[in-house]
Amino acid sequence: MKKKYRYLEDSKNYTSTLYSLLVDNVDKPGYSDICDVLLQVSKKLDNTQSVEALINRLVNYIRITASTYKIIFSKKEEELIIKLGVIGQKAGLNGQYMADFSDKSQFYSVFDQ
C-alpha cells in the first residue's frame, strides 16, 4: 500500500464524523470556522500529497481556534480530535516552524470555489 493512502480512510472517517458532531453548534462562535475547515479538508484528502501533513495542520487549527473561542469539546469530539492528532504526528515537524496555525486560508487554494 502506498504511503499516501496509509491514513486516508481513517482521516476521512474521523473528519466527517467530527463535522457531523460539530455542525449542530455552528451558530456559536468558532464552530463555523472549524466546520468550514473540516469540509475543506474532507474535499482535499483524496488529492493531497501528504494526508498526515494536512491532518496535522487541521488539528493545530482546531486547537488554536478552540483556545481562542474557549470551546470545550465533548468527550466523543475530543476523542476524534486526538485520533486525528495521532495521524498528524506522523508528518513530523516539517513546515510547522513559525507557521500561523490560526490562518484559515491555509486550507484553501487560489483555485477553490
From Swiss-Prot:
GO terms classed as biological process: bacteriocin immunity
Positions in coiled-coil regions: none
Keywords from the UniProt entry: Bacteriocin immunity, Plasmid
InterPro entries in alphabetical order: LciA_Immunity-like, Ta0600-like_sf
Highest taxon listed in the record's lineage: Bacteria
SUPFAM superfamilies found in the cross-reference section: Bacteriocin immunity protein-like
Family classification: Belongs to the immunity protein EntA family.
Job of this protein: Imparts immunity to mesentericin-Y105 to naturally sensitive host strains.
Protein name: Probable mesentericin-Y105 immunity protein
Organism, as annotated: Leuconostoc mesenteroides
Gene: mesI
